[in-house]
UniProtKB/Swiss-Prot annotation:
One GO BP: lysyl-tRNA aminoacylation
Cofactor(s) needed by this chain: Mg(2+)
Complex formation: Homodimer.
Protein name: Lysine--tRNA ligase
The organism of origin for this protein: Bacillus cereus (strain AH820)
GN (gene name): lysS
Keyword line: Aminoacyl-tRNA synthetase, ATP-binding, Cytoplasm, Ligase, Magnesium, Metal-binding, Nucleotide-binding, Protein biosynthesis
Pfam families with a match to the protein in the record: tRNA-synt_2, tRNA_anti-codon
Length: 499
């Protein structure tokens, strides 16, 4: 900001503070009291928008509305303004002879951004705009800072994220995104509740970071003098509940991963995890596609959505593709025949797939998938059959134990869900954890820790179980056509602002 703009802004701040002082001198509270509203702006349009000018004059409909002044014009003894609430804007018409000298003076000196209450009659202007003719004007909150330019809103994307309140004031699209987010989560809950699932709450601070491959945030509990980890997944506590006999459970909550920030990643994000006893990953596939289609229908009214340049069809049944078949289809590499790690590394070299020296065959298969296949999966696709090495909590496949009964859901080349037939053999689970510990020793700090308490829970017997995790932020991105995860998080993680 140059010096001239800086001085101009200071002048505006001073003028508004002077108005604040004058209001107090007159005995008017610039940060007023409760105001009774009869209608929101969208109510007025839906209830009275179809009435003619003459019908409204005849009916003399009285309303009481409140909102923020977004535009203002007029001089002398009358003026117009648009006030905005959550749902939109409506025009108000204020005449001195209708509201009186004192209230008209309040209107005249009001600034853009001030919050006001209006009592009046609904009417239509000569050009047909539904409006409210004020009979009363109340200042509810004096705004001490000018809003961003009303014609351009917030052009600085970073400012939109840092000062989300300004973004919400100036962008109806942004407000609609977050209202839609709330509706998506509400419909998800409704769908699961209606299908017999029980919503539960489990700890966010864990003694052991488990349930996913990720770096945790670490904190310290002073009273207990112990390190705790902010949860990287909800999984292991929910599966303990399955052991305890709660047969269908879910939790919607925050998860924390001490990793990079990108258009798809935020260090804290919202997940839903659910588990169902006596089910497997194929049952969870059906649940996933039916639930997402239900949410789209209820919230958007359609299962055909636009995301960027793509038209996406969310109507079940979605494509199901084994990871090895997907790799073969898109790269020609065939991992169906068992091979040594040396042969797998040679195949990676042949196909220009980057790998690390510590990787086993299963890791290399996964690298093939991520580098050769993932970005081609646009329409909803269940990729199943992940290698055992990268799936320490999933049950081995009966027909080919190199792979697991696990799937990931990909839409627009992004992972949206991860699901297993859960591993319920405590001996196998302990061996998997031990293999993960070896990976940690070799430098993989995202490998799973040993969790003896969870092993003990499994030893009491967990029924065959299907489990699912969905990243809610990414689902909201998909259903609102948002290009970045920051567009669907009210307050995304940001670096400290540089002065």
């Amino acid at each position: 900001m140059d010096n001239m703009n800086h001085e101009e802004l200071n002048d505006q701040l001073l003028v508004r503070r002077e108005k604040l002082h004058n209001l107090r001198e007159q005995g008017i509270d610039p940060f007023g009291k409760r105001f009774e509203r009869t209608n929101a702006t969208n109510d007025l349009l839906s209830l009275y928008g179809e009435f003619s000018k003459e019908e409204l004059e005849e009916k003399e409909i009285s309303v009481s509305i409140a909102g923020r002044i977004m535009t203002k014009r007029g001089k002398g003894k009358a003026g117009f303004a648009h006030i905005q609430d959550l749902h939109g804007q409506v025009q108000i018409y204020v005449r001195k002879d209708a509201v009186g000298d004192e209230e008209y003076e309040l209107f005249k000196t009001a600034d853009l951004g001030d919050l006001v209450g209006i009592e009046g009659k609904v009417f239509k202007t000569n050009v047909g705009e539904l409006s409210v003719k004020a009979t009363g004007f109340t200042l509810l909150t004096k705004s001490l800072r000018p809003l961003p330019d009303k014609y351009h809103g917030l052009k600085d994307v970073e400012q939109r994220y840092r000062q989300r309140y300004l973004d919400l004031i100036t962008s109806m699209e942004s407000r609609e995104t977050f209202v839609t987010r709330s509706k998506i989560i509400r419909e998800m809950r409704r769908y699961l509740d209606d299908n017999g699932y029980l919503e539960v709450e489990t700890p966010m601070m864990h003694a052991i970071a488990g349930g996913a491959s990720a770096r945790p945030f670490i904190t310290h509990h002073n009273a207990l003098d112990m390190e705790l980890y902010m949860r990287i997944a909800i999984e292991l506590h929910l599966k303990r509940l399955i052991v305890g006999g709660l047969e269908k459970v879910y939790e919607i909550g925050r998860v924390f991963r001490n990793e990079g920030v990108s258009t798809r990643h935020n260090p804290e994000f919202t997940m839903i995890e659910l588990y169902e006893a006596y089910a497997d990953y194929k049952d969870i596939m059906k649940l996933t596609e039916n639930m997402v289609a239900h949410i789209a229908k209820q919230v958007l009214g359609t299962t055909t959505i636009q995301y960027g340049d793509y038209e996406i069809n969310l109507e079940p049944k979605w494509t199901r593709l084994h990871m090895v078949d997907a790799i073969k289809e898109h790269s020609g590499a065939d991992f169906w025949n068992p091979m040594s790690v040396e042969e797998a590394r040679e195949l990676a070299k042949e196909h220009n797939v980057e790998i690390k020296d510590t990787m086993e065959v299963g890791h290399i298969i996964n690298e093939f998938f991520e580098q050769k296949v993932e970005d081609k999966l646009i329409q909803p696709t269940f990729i199943y059959g992940h290698p055992v090495e990268i799936s320490p909590l999933a049950k081995k496949n009966d027909e080919d134990p190199r792979f697991t009964d696990r799937f990931e859901l990909f839409i627009v080349a992004r992972e949206h869900a991860n699901a297993f037939t859960e591993l319920n053999d405590p001996i196998d689970q302990k061996e998997r954890f031990e293999a993960q510990l070896k990976e940690r020793e070799q430098g993989n700090d995202e490998a799973h820790m040993m969790d003896d308490d969870y092993i003990e829970a499994l030893e009491y017997g967990m029924p065959p179980t299907g489990g699912l995790g969905i990243g809610i932020d990414r689902l909201v991105m998909l259903l609102t056509n948002a290009p970045s995860i920051r567009d669907v998080l009210l307050f995304p993680a940001m670096r400290h602002k540089q002065d």
